[in-house]
A protein has these predicted regions:
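Multi-pass membrane proteins that catalyze or facilitate reactions on polyprenyl-/lipid-phosphate substrates
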Residues: 1-182
Length: 182
């Protein structure tokens, strides 16, 4: 259920998003905005009603999927948007994070498949070397992501997301400085 909204919106608006929103200023603003939202959410927490992923119902999953659509805007973290959606729906940090990573699998696969199809239609078939690098890169990214997910899930059991909020704000300011001031 959580994947459906993003799949529909992503397919319908892919070119528009790529043409109009893939700007450094949009990325900087969304980095800062979501950083502020993370800090706000941590300072004003909702009551945690959902303590285990098994208690997550279809309605909440669909709502979290709608939050995932926000990640179509460049600079928005897909996992950040879905974690915020989970917290909004009353999930614990751990459940929100776990569900966010479950949602990533079909969305990342679908987005990658769409980009590969666009590439094939525009350029043609991959060379053997390109195909090898694509498969190797995918495998390495998958293995590294498993370690990163495990580390993040361990982190959120004992910490909040405030540090991620500040990280996003600082990175957004750096993007503005780098591309518009320096």
């Amino acid at each position: 259920m959580g994947v459906i909204p993003c799949a529909i919106i992503g397919l319908l608006l892919d070119n528009i998003i790529e043409d109009y929103l893939s700007k450094n200023i949009v990325i900087a603003i969304t980095l800062i905005l979501y950083g502020m939202i993370f800090i706000f959410v941590e300072k004003h927490p909702k009551k945690e009603k959902i303590q285990t992923i098994e208690r997550l119902d279809y309605k909440s999953a669909l709502k979290i999927g709608c939050f995932q659509c926000l990640a179509l805007i460049p600079g928005t973290s897909r996992s950040g948007a879905t974690i915020l959606g989970g917290l909004y729906c009353g999930c614990s940090r751990t459940v929100a994070s776990e569900f966010s990573f479950f949602l990533a699998i079909p969305v990342m696969f679908g987005a990658t498949l769409l980009k590969v199809i666009k590439y094939l239609m525009k350029v043609g078939l991959f060379s053997f070397g390109q195909l090898f690098l694509l498969v190797l890169g995918t495998f390495v990214a998958f293995v590294v992501s498993l370690f990163a997910i495990k580390a993040l899930l361990n982190y959120v059991k004992n910490h909040d997301f405030t540090v991620f909020g500040w990280y996003r704000i600082i990175l957004g300011i750096f993007v503005i400085l780098f591309f518009y001031i320096l």
